């Protein structure tokens, strides 16, 4: 259900601000988005998996907090990130 390490490394390489960056808000949001999408696919098949549903809600809340932080600190980075991830319409 969780994303593979290879996919996570690809996401980190794409959104990292510098070499070895795994903790910036952009990287964390991108990894959480991939996790959220993966859990959504799982829940489409397993509708009654309430433990995964709770995990999904926790990840969505964490991503929401990180997005609010990024929007508050650097609006341009926030806009670029949501455009590249396709989060807002």
UniProtKB/Swiss-Prot annotation:
Keyword terms of this UniProt record: Ribonucleoprotein, Ribosomal protein, RNA-binding, rRNA-binding
Q: Which domain of life is it from?
A: Bacteria
Give disulfide pairs as residue numbers.
Answer: none
Locate the coiled-coil region(s) and give their ranges.
none
Q: Which PANTHER family match?
A: RIBOSOMAL PROTEIN S15, BACTERIAL AND ORGANELLAR (PTHR23321), SMALL RIBOSOMAL SUBUNIT PROTEIN US15M (PTHR23321:SF26)
- Name-wise, this protein is Small ribosomal subunit protein uS15
Q: Which gene is this protein's source?
A: rpsO
Q: Which organism is it from?
A: Pediococcus pentosaceus (strain ATCC 25745 / CCUG 21536 / LMG 10740 / 183-1w)
What family does the database annotate?
Belongs to the universal ribosomal protein uS15 family.
